[in-house]
Amino acid sequence: MSAPAAGATAGGDDAADRNVEMWKIKRLIKSLELARGNGTSMISLIIPPKDQVARIQRMLAEEYGTASNIKSRVNRLSVLGAITSVQGRLKLYNKVPPNGLVVYCGTIMTDEGKEKKVNIDFEPFKAINTSLYLCDNKFHTEALQGLLADDNKFGFIIMDGNGCLFGTLQGNTREVLHKFTVDLPKKHGRGGQSAVRFARLRNEKRHNYVRKVAENSVEQFIKNDKVTVAGLILAGSADFKTELGQSDMFDQRLQAKMIKTVDIAYGGENGFNQAIELAADTLASVKFIQEKKLIGGYFDEISQDTGKYVFGVKDTLAALEMGAIETLICWENLDIVRYKMKNSLGEDILLNLRPDEEKDKSHFTDSETGQDMEIIETMPLLEWFANNYKNFGAALEIVTDKSQEGAQFVRGFGGIGGLLRYRVDLAHVDLEDELDNIDLDDYSRAAVVSHWAPYSFLLLFKLVSSFFFINLFINYPALSNYNISLSQSSSSLIAISHTTLYSKFLFHFIEFAPRVPHYCRFVWSVDAFSSAGKASHVCQHTEKETFHARNEDAIGGLFNRTKVEARATHSHSMTSTLSLPSVDVSTRNSNDF
């Protein structure tokens, strides 16, 4: 069981690092709360700043003597072992760290019913002013919960003609405290002599509505004669919010906490969300607003197709290893596990699997030998990111799904992505990896001949028909008013493109495109082993000139384009040279074939 790294700055200068430390604390609390042991062998020790390590050591020595009198032998040995472990941990510290020290030691029971020793010590990322020593059958984490809460909580009062809502915003948590509805009379021009009476009744009900809101605000935001929020924001349509803020019925303590009044177009929870957005400049320090802004910027990059974004486990890890990711965005409950394994050759294999993929045993089997690979290490991918993101020069942002943008990021992009420093063509990276994995023995002469033998007749037919039509147009020029010619000394080009292990052999015999009606073109292409939907379009040039092959890779409806430079050499074996005037042969696109 891992613990948060010690030595985090007390002030939390780097907000991203602070959020990572908060996630580590949250994950630690969750795992410690589930741990259970036999007897009272689990020790929870919290030492506040400026306390003395020597004093704690003396206290533990006294506890050791007391625990020696426990009658149960098993429980006595467990407690003594836990106290000894705590004493050993304290020997690592000459003094209490600036933010205090947290120690958890003991023997817990695993899901398989086996005993497991747990020893955790760390300095929290901000000061913890609590002193605690408990020996129980569970770890006590109540004091750590205060580390997760932001210092500032803001209150919201949403008023309109249909009702009122009271809510709070703290960190990335939005909470609705109370809401009620009202039925207020509307303005109208009827009434005759009773019009004044109707107006008086309407104003009376509005007054009673404002008074009810003022009374409820005291119940929701004042506890034990103290205001429970750092600031109060009034939001609503019409003049209700203004009347409330200026009314004598509104508690003076709450009036002093008013920081902003905003106009909204909705009531209820929709109005609550709109009020949070409109008050974003005031609430800039709240994590909820920061999270919405971060993911909103990520969506803007995608909508504008800037290419400076990445999503998905494979592409995100590839960009991270290249050092291209500036901000790594991950969902706090990302359920991907990182496996490090060894195959029969002693090579390290890394896999990142989701829970449904872990059920497939083929991921843990060596494809060459059929034997199970040795699992060296398993770790949640998010924990690996938290421990290593600085090594790649990236900032890690851990987000929730409590905001609308966060929920969309989790559902639509799997909860993992990143903002890039510059554009990265990940399709080109994948292509290079695939080319490195190609075994040329699979394309031996015998294999190629045996595969292409059935197509030999078709090849012969295409070549013969090509020369037939050429001679036809040369001998009978009246058939066309257009000139017929070939490109200089390089009339045919063979392009063999290896794109995957089940590669494509794409033979393009681009033969004499005469500009006659309907453009008679004699092109033969064979697409074999098509598994990745890739094709290479070759632009023909003169001998020993550079050509560019444009790779179009259709994955998930997106096209990633990669330019690959190669050298074209003159092919004499499959080319016929004719002394005809030369014109350009236009490059075909995918629709031509």
Swiss-Prot record:
Gene Ontology CC, one term? translation release factor complex
Q: Which Gene3D superfamilies match?
A: 3.30.1330.30, eRF1 domain 1 (3.30.960.10), eRF1 domain 2 (3.30.420.60)
Q: Which SMART domains match?
A: eRF1_1
GO terms for MF: sequence-specific mRNA binding; translation release factor activity, codon specific
Pfam families per record: eRF1_1 (PF03463), eRF1_2 (PF03464), eRF1_3 (PF03465)
- Among its keywords, does the record have Cytoplasm? yes
Output the InterPro entries linked to this UniProt entry. eFR1_2_sf, eRF1_1_Pelota, eRF1_1_sf, eRF1_2, eRF1_3, Peptide_chain-rel_eRF1/aRF1, Ribosomal_eL30-like_sf
Q: Which GO terms describe its biological process?
A: cytoplasmic translational termination
Q: Where in the cell is it found?
A: Cytoplasm
Q: Has UniProt tagged this entry with the keyword Lipoprotein?
A: no
Q: Which UniProt keywords apply?
A: Cytoplasm, Protein biosynthesis
* Function comment: Directs the termination of nascent peptide synthesis (translation) in response to the termination codons UAA, UAG and UGA.
Protein family per UniProt? Belongs to the eukaryotic release factor 1 family.
Subunit composition and interactions: Heterodimer of two subunits, one of which binds GTP.
* Name of the molecule in the record: Eukaryotic peptide chain release factor subunit 1
Organism name: Caenorhabditis elegans
